[in-house]
Regions:
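Peripheral, non-catalytic segments that deliver or gate enzyme domains
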Residues: 1-91, 95-107, 119-136, 176-180
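A fold-wide structural signal in alpha/beta-hydrolase
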Residues: 110, 132-144, 303
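Flexible loop residues that form catalytic
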Residues: 41, 54, 116, 194, ...
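Conserved hydrophobic/aromatic "anchor" residues
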Residues: 82, 108, 138, 212, ...
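Active-site-proximal cap/loop segments of hydrolase catalytic domains
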Residues: 143-337
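The conserved beta1-alpha1 loop
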Residues: 114-116, 276
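Hydrophobic residues at beta-strand termini and immediately following loops
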Residues: 62, 80-82, 114, 143, ...
Length: 337
């Protein structure tokens, strides 16, 4: 952390001693700067809000954000890093099932979870989806592949026109790192992601058919050409930038075909579960429809869950429950073989 003055530094360090293992954010402060509103969180809790008086050093809890969560039942999210095949340092997070650590975790079933965006990042903190998977016995690896934000301009620009190529290699290299460490059972690895992560799931199944025993694609892109043609109106001002960062549908057509999973379904050998919202404004439902149709024509096992009342990710509680129950059943079936 960087502080503007010694008083702020002393105050924050005093507060931090009361919350070992938690991140602390200041969400409000009075004009005299002696009364602060704090928000805490960790990898195992959404934390709480507190009011702190720096004059008499008193702390009062205002409210727990998620009082129903038992932190003792949650898993730790461990910061990790590995090297890509071309020498980039890739940071990420490994969440192990309860009771495991880096020393005793051996031959576990694994879910590789690339984030969406792709120009976003995974961060340390409570993630209910990751905790759900860890609770079901899976080790979960999240990685900030090239293009992820927060690592500088050079790392960001290293992703330009690298969808399905070096960006995908970063994900593959993370999977191989887990295998080499002995943490992953190489016969029980699935890949799951949403949006760009769904695209990375499909490309992972295409490029590494022997590495992944199953895949879950959640609102992912399958065809770079139709994806570009169906972007929402509010993205149209960015289309030229998309051509520069992802690829121009005319000038880079050969490359875009190479990295469009729908054209390489014949390379997929493992079962796939696809979930999609029919009213998705960002990734049109046709992206998933095309993929399912192509897989069925090739005789590749695929399950499809499409919801008419959903967009880019499920928001309705009943649909979310259905999706996670279906994914749990699918992973349990495919990774227990």
């Amino acid at each position: 952390r960087h502080y503007f003055d010694s008083t702020s530094k002393a105050t924050f360090e005093k507060i931090q001693k009361q919350f070992a293992g938690y991140e602390i954010g200041i969400t409000g402060v009075n004009k005299a700067e002696n009364i602060l509103i704090l928000r805490t969180y960790s990898d195992k809790s959404l934390g709480a809000y507190y009011i702190y008086n720096s004059e008499d050093d008193t702390m009062e809890k205002i409210v727990e954000v998620s009082p129903w969560i038992d932190e003792n039942e949650m898993s730790n999210q461990l910061p990790v890093d590995y090297q890509s095949r071309d020498g980039l340092k890739i940071n990420g997070y490994l969440t192990l099932p309860k009771g495991y650590n880096m020393e005793n975790a051996k031959n576990l079933p694994v879910v590789i979870n690339p984030h969406g965006g792709p120009w976003a990042r995974d961060s340390w903190g409570f993630n209910p989806e990751i905790q759900f998977l860890a609770n079901r016995g899976y080790a979960v690896l999240q990685m900030n592949f090239r293009g992820s934000t927060g690592y500088g301009r050079k790392f960001f620009e290293a992703s330009f026109k690298k969808w399905g190529r070096e960006m995908q290699d970063d994900i593959t290299d993370g999977t191989q790192w887990l295998i080499d460490k002995g943490i992953a059972d190489s016969t029980r690895i699935a890949i799951y992601g949403g949006s760009y992560g769904g695209y990375a799931t499909l490309m992972g199944m295409v490029k590494e058919p022997k590495m992944y025993a199953a895949g879950v694609d959640y609102v992912g892109v399958s065809n770079m050409f139709t994806f570009m043609k169906t972007i929402p109106p509010y993205w149209e001002p960015m289309l030229e930038m998309m051509y520069e960062m992802v690829g121009d549908v005319e000038k880079d057509s050969a490359m875009l075909r190479e990295v469009s999973p729908v054209f390489h379904v014949d390379k997929i050998k493992a079962p796939l579960f696809i979930a999609q919202g029919a009213n998705d404004p960002r990734v049109n439902v046709d992206e998933s429809d095309q993929m399912v149709k192509a897989m069925k024509e090739k005789g590749v096992e695929v399950e499809y869950l499409v919801k008419k009342d959903e967009g880019h990710g499920f928001r309705n509680e009943e649909n979310r429950f259905e999706f996670y129950r279906a994914m749990e059943k699918f992973l349990n079936l495919q990774l227990s073989k």
